[in-house]
Design a protein with these regions (language model features):
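Conserved alpha/beta-hydrolase "acid-adjacent" motif
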Residues: 114-120
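C-terminal alpha-helix
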Residues: 154-162
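Short beta-strand/loop motif that positions the catalytic acidic residue
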Residues: 101, 107-109
Length: 162
């Protein structure tokens, strides 16, 4: 955003932009996010409802084993780590206006997360008016890169190598 590093092309993949809300509201959202995370970690049904195993398990992998491993790993997060993840993801500072740059920017999001990305898309359009907004059909957040890495690479190559 400062223009200190020359960048010809940039992909913002489902990027979370800073909240444009009062501090107290941001703290309440942090509490909601932490509670949601802890509920998913401590209740397998909630975790699987949020990320259905049949959709988020790589082909050839056992969904039960995968989700057992995810569940065990997520339980290692301390409350402070969870707090830091959510707070830093939503509450960082950018310059009031970005540097005047010639960077080609695209913002990717999964079509199935469009409602969740509405404020992020609005922010990107305002902050980087030259950005191209691109919805990825039939995808949820992070699904393209996690489950379809070859397709992710095709999108990447198409944007970076044109």
């Amino acid at each position: 955003a400062l223009g200190e590093l020359p960048v010809k092309r940039a992909i913002i993949d489902g990027g979370i932009t800073p909240y444009q809300l009062p501090y107290l509201i941001r703290k309440l959202l942090l509490a909601r996010d932490m509670l949601s995370f802890k509920l998913a970690v401590n209740n397998r049904k909630i975790l699987e409802a949020a990320f259905p195993p049949e959709r988020f398990t790589l082909p050839g992998h056992d969904p039960k084993k995968e989700y057992d491993a995810i569940e065990a790993y997520l339980k290692t997060y301390s409350d402070q780590t969870i707090r830091n993840i959510f707070w830093s993801g939503n509450n960082y500072v950018l310059p009031k206006t970005p540097a005047k740059i010639g960077t080609k920017i695209t913002y990717w999001y999964g079509d199935e997360e469009k409602k969740d990305r509405r404020s992020n898309i609005r922010f990107i359009k305002h902050y980087f008016p030259q950005a191209r907004i691109h919805g990825i059909p039939k995808m949820a957040h992070a699904e393209l890169v996690m489950i379809y890495p070859e397709e992710f690479c095709r999108y990447f190559d198409k944007f970076m190598c044109r």
